[in-house]
Amino acid sequence: MVTVGVFSERASLTHQLGEFIVKKQDEALQKKSDFKVSVSGGSLIDALYESLVADESLSSRVQWSKWQIYFSDERIVPLTDADSNYGAFKRAVLDKLPSTSQPNVYPMDESLIGSDAESNNKIAAEYERIVPQVLDLVLLGCGPDGHTCSLFPGETHRYLLNETTKRVAWCHDSPKPPSDRITFTLPVLKDAKALCFVAEGSSKQNIMHEIFDLKNDQLPTALVNKLFGEKTSWFVNEEAFGKVQTKTF
């Protein structure tokens, strides 16, 4: 069963998100020397800044130097490009941390960027090579269309949801620019110890209704709930959850 937290105030959401992440960190570090986590782009990055950097009650508990950070998806653009998830995470989080408390971060290899399918497949294959078999925590967003990572709904994009061999794949037709991306596929999410979605705002109302009331598993986010619900948590605000009727998840 999926775990869902619904919050009336952003500060409460980000604080509880931070508590959740730090708990997962501590659980991992009790058993081994590092915490393997992946992040996505978009509004999730701002939530992570507020949870783990700006929240003083939590920031001192984050053992950044023991974090190994990967990216659940990335746009195939230079890392300094405004569309880069790594670049956004660097500006919002990494640049705010002291030089003595930096995590190990694994961005896409931008030196491989070309202009053809061979280059893009090579970028995905190279990233798959460095992503651990088991991540301790995968932090995810949810688009208004129900996409997560760069796994989009619709038959055009079904090849990514059906992928069982490649753990990182080239998404060559994103409906949102830039069209070329690399993305985790479902096998990575299957092997991860915990999955966590963050969704906020009125633009998410209709898709939250489809995910939680209609349980439309044609949507990648709803499919994740269906397949991996026992280890999946959602942090949402009341605005996003305004049309959801169900009380059982």
UniProtKB/Swiss-Prot annotation:
Documented EC number(s): 3.1.1.31
Name of the protein in its database record: 6-phosphogluconolactonase 3
Substrates-to-products reaction catalysed: 6-phospho-D-glucono-1,5-lactone + H2O = 6-phospho-D-gluconate + H(+)
Family designation: Belongs to the glucosamine/galactosamine-6-phosphate isomerase family. 6-phosphogluconolactonase subfamily.
Stored PANTHER family: 6-PHOSPHOGLUCONOLACTONASE, 6-PHOSPHOGLUCONOLACTONASE 3-RELATED
Gene name per UniProt: SOL3
Species of provenance: Saccharomyces cerevisiae (strain ATCC 204508 / S288c) (Baker's yeast)
GO cellular component: cytoplasm; cytosol; nucleus
InterPro entries documented for this protein: 6-phosphogluconolactonase_DevB, Glc/Gal-6P_isomerase, NagB/RpiA_transferase-like, PGLS
Major location category of this protein: cytoplasm
Extra information: Present with 3420 molecules/cell in log phase SD medium.
One Pfam short name: Glucosamine_iso
Pathway assigned to this chain's UniProt record: Carbohydrate degradation; pentose phosphate pathway; D-ribulose 5-phosphate from D-glucose 6-phosphate (oxidative stage): step 2/3
Gene Ontology MF terms: 6-phosphogluconolactonase activity
Keyword vocabulary terms for this entry: Cytoplasm, Hydrolase, Nucleus
Gene Ontology BP terms: carbohydrate metabolic process; pentose-phosphate shunt, oxidative branch
Cellular localization per UniProt: Cytoplasm; Nucleus
